[in-house]
Amino acid sequence: MIKRLLTLAVLSLPLAAHADEGMWTIDNFPSGTVDDKYDVDVTGKWLKAAQLATTRLENGCTGSFASPDGLVLTNNHCTWGCIRNLSTAERNLSTEGFTAATKGDELQCPGQQLSVLVGFEEVTDKIAAATADMTEAKANEARKAALTRLESACEAASDGERRCEAVTLYNGGQYFIYEYKRYDDVRLAFAPELDIGAFGGDPDNFNFPRWSLDMSLLRAYEDGKPAATPNYLRWRASGPRAGEPVFITGHPGSTDRLLSVAQLKFQRDVALPLWLLRYSELRGRMLAWQYTSDEAARTVQQRILNYENAIKVRRNQLKALLNDRMIARKAKEERVLREAVAADPELQAAYGDAWELIDRSLQTHRNFYEEHLFIEEAGGLAGDLYRNAKTLVRGTAEREKPNGERIRAYTDAALPQLEQRLFAARPIDKEFEKLQLTFSLEKMREWLGPDSPWVRSILGNDAPDALAA
């Protein structure tokens, strides 16, 4: 599970291309630099207000409170899952759009959760103390146990009112406990029809300006009533002025800027090509399947757009990594860093062998990468039904263990969110499940080989489509 962080970026309009580069966590915002450069005093009070007005949707999106009674503004694609789960053959909200005339007309999104970061504590020193003088293998187990204890202590201190998550920054350079207020009742208030919300489709995606109504409105509820949210962002109809600093808060995904050259080459030579080969073909099968029936088209329309978005991202990542000048620049940056480490005896003693250790770990990783991808990461066993079955089986086994010894996704702190996702009343299209499972089993057999013990164990004498049926 990716831990998503609250970060803040600054743009200087009118040209985003002229924006200052970089994102900062709320605890590390460079207020002095911003004041010097833009003559804007970003106070701690302002940062706290922005933090409390920013929401995290548990499907990986960011939103903002836009009213004192729980209204949340987010991107249109962030509500596609909700829209798909609420739609039927008779009422397709994707093509019709949705507007709730009153709060009573708002529709609950199955399994959707929304969180607000209300506090955080750096625990780097505590983790360092818990793992001191240990081998890496033992330190890894001790680290997991310590983070689990800290999560549990955080939740106990709030009498169960808050959800706490351990967050790792900079590949272990810092550790935090993030404390969230979580809303388990999230309802759809407004969404444009897909033809407007994603106007231009894949060709227009990542082109700016883009002429689409890329927004939806949700509402957070508590105890069956709209949540009281006094910290919200006010609407300014006039919009930003040319040259005016604009600050953006959100819960972004991860970046790969800190990867070593060897890790970037692994992405270039192994991970990205394999991903693109698989998902480009899966997209093609979805495109063909959507024409088999109106229901098939409704089921995969938004998913196709999601895959096209991901394919475009990874295709351009690969294009960048195939650029010799880019790799040469990263190699130069790494060389400068290694020379700086070597020049400091203390740093050399602690980190001088880091790059060699990374190289060796990548060699080991390469030896089992495909098996891990197709088996553990379910690249060969796709679909909601398999994912739910795996969660139930593994969750049962993990809950028999002490909390500190469990896989992190099954700790007491993680279970409420896991259970809500697992038991949400989401419709499952059996024909689409067959399509996904058939495809993934075929790819598993193709990449691992028909004589792989894993393939023989899973398929036996069955063909992928027969087993999926």
Describe the residue ranges of each PLM region.
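Terminal presequence/propeptide segments associated with secretion/organelle targeting
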Residues: I2, A9, L15-A469
